[in-house]
């Protein structure tokens, strides 16, 4: 495995063979793929200043998870979507589980540490997703010791 990430988004361990991925439609995120461009992990984080939180809304993981779920719900390629609770490195997380009409799976974990909400997403096939999500939940931290820069 190799450790990837940034001080802004945190760090996770991913398989050594995974490579940096650039999605032309999104900027400012960290993404890696197994080379297929089908299995992709995305790391992001937002501060209160960066989040588009409406008056009366609280800036926290639950609110950001609701925003993420709403954004997904606006897409026309969703077969099924549901939420659940989880943990990332011992921190309570909101998990958004998605099955796309193509059969591809998507899973987003939203959690808060200090004054930031972190968003870890995975899109891909079921076999890769199951292993990846478990590993991601166990290895995420703000500790970049041993991280590679690519």
PLM regions: where:
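N-terminal "mature-domain start" segment
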Residues: 1-27
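Extracellular/lumenal ectodomain signal focusing on beta-strand-rich modules
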Residues: 16-17, 82, 95, 138-139
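Surface-exposed amphipathic alpha-helical segments
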Residues: 18, 116-150
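Conserved polar/disulfide-associated segments of primarily extracytoplasmic proteins
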Residues: 24-118
């Amino acid at each position: 495995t190799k450790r990837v990430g940034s001080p802004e988004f945190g760090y996770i361990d991913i398989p050594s063979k995974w490579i940096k991925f650039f999605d032309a439609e999104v900027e400012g995120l960290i993404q890696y793929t197994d080379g297929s461009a089908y299995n992709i992990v995305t790391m992001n984080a937002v501060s209160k200043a960066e989040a588009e939180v409406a008056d009366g809304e609280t800036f926290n993981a639950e609110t950001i998870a609701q925003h993420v779920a709403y954004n997904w719900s606006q897409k026309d390629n969703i077969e099924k979507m549901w939420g659940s609770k989880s943990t990332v490195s011992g921190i309570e997380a909101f998990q958004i589980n998605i099955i796309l009409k193509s059969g591809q799976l998507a899973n987003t974990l939203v959690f808060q540490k200090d004054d930031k909400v972190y968003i870890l997403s995975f899109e891909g096939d079921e076999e890769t997703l199951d292993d990846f999500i478990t590993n991601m939940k166990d290895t995420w931290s703000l500790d970049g010791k041993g991280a590679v820069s690519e």
